[in-house]
Amino acid sequence: MSQNHTILQSLPVGQKVGIAFSGGLDTSAALLWMKLKGALPYAYTANLGQPDEDDYNAIPKKAMEYGAENARLIDCRAQLAHEGIAAIQCGAFHVSTGGIAYFNTTPLGRAVTGTMLVSAMKEDDVNIWGDGSTYKGNDIERFYRYGLLTNPALKIYKPWLDQQFIDELGGRHEMSEFLIANGFNYKMSVEKAYSTDSNMLGATHEAKDLEFLNSGIKIVKPIMGVAFWDENVEVSPEEVSVRFEEGVPVALNGKEYADPVELFLEANRIGGRHGLGMSDQIENRIIEAKSRGIYEAPGMALFHIAYERLVTGIHNEDTIEQYRINGLRLGRLLYQGRWFDSQALMLRETAQRWVAKAVTGEVTLELRRGNDYSILNTESPNLTYQPERLSMEKVEDAAFTPLDRIGQLTMRNLDITDTRVKLGIYSQSGLLSLGEGSVLPQLGNKQ
């Protein structure tokens, strides 16, 4: 199937066109414009537990007012929680600065939205899909991939790639005037200094003033937590416990949650009271151009900290290393819209089976301001951390003796000798300078 047959560059008049409808200015104007130009628009809205959305049920009603043939609200929260837990289990986070990660909350949301909305469209025999993503961003490719994975007969029509739409409604002012001219009392909201996209797992703030690196996190008004950098905002230390069973978070502060959606919402409330999980990242988009974002993810951060504490106390060094390497690779695949590709499923299955299954236990933390926290206690029946093995005190039945360590160190002579030989080779070839004043002066001793 060639791109020319898949991507429609002009409006398919007389045909059903599904649109991912948010109720905002862009999708409202696009839906009405498509209707007036002769298409049959069908509106689909994903309920992702967006923290900045007050009334989900009002969105489909608004779509019908703008001329949709039908409008549906698709509850995606349970699937989003499932994918969020999978990302935690795999450590699927490749973007970080100074050890603080971006939890790929937007890519996770796109994986769920792209598959579930297109599945709903198939039920209505709608095989043309449009959304609000622009040609410069990541989402246009993510939705393209997930849409075609779900429905191989899908065709893509995006008003923002249609030159006629751009010529007639090229900006927010033109779209607002278009709605008013057609009898809709649309009052354009005051534009923020940045744009925000959110779901139950996290929020993304980017563009506009945030494109400039001298505009920092302080211009952002958090929607999932507090502005912890503001000294006038009171943030009190708080102890919280997180319990996992076979890699799945199941309880907060001793209270079990059968519904993972409710679990995430409570984790967001707890972490949000402190601004936990906020970060400022420069990242590489799919097309290899750099962008900048301010991110919130209080619940994901809380689960990630507790999960990794248990991972390090349960698994050996080689397993932890592989978990981290695979997590970086999987995070990038997730970011690229390949969360359901075979190479991603292989990495996911490895972590979920061999890492997560052993992660049972409870971690207690003290949360303070932002990403400032302390781990107070770690408990697990599977801990391989046994302090008596390395105790500096005299213990009965020691795991090993001084003579055992002498033998172990003696065996190291083999690779130390090999390393000295190689360093000599590097010196002779000019790669290393050995002897007096060099980094390794002792190697210049011919004796």
From Swiss-Prot:
PROSITE patterns: ARGININOSUCCIN_SYN_1, ARGININOSUCCIN_SYN_2. L-citrulline binds at residues 102, 138, 142, 195, 204, 206, 283. It comes from the Bacteria. One of its GO terms (cellular component) is cytoplasm. Keywords: Amino-acid biosynthesis, Arginine biosynthesis, ATP-binding, Cytoplasm, Ligase, Nucleotide-binding. One of its GO terms (molecular function) is ATP binding. L-aspartate binds at residues 134, 138-139. InterPro entries: Arg_succ_synth_type2_subfam (IPR023437), Arginosuc_syn_C (IPR048268), Arginosuc_syn_N (IPR048267), Arginosuc_synth (IPR001518), Arginosuc_synth_CS (IPR018223), Arginosuc_synth_type_1_subfam (IPR023434), AS_cat/multimer_dom_body (IPR024074), AS_multimer_C_tail (IPR024073). ATP binds at residues 20-28, 46, 132, 134, 139, 197. One of its GO terms (biological process) is L-arginine biosynthetic process. It catalyses: L-citrulline + L-aspartate + ATP = 2-(N(omega)-L-arginino)succinate + AMP + diphosphate + H(+). Coiled coil: none annotated. Its EC number is 6.3.4.5. Homotetramer. Belongs to the argininosuccinate synthase family. Type 2 subfamily. This is Argininosuccinate synthase. The lineage of its organism: Bacteria, Pseudomonadati, Pseudomonadota, Betaproteobacteria, Neisseriales. The gene is argG.
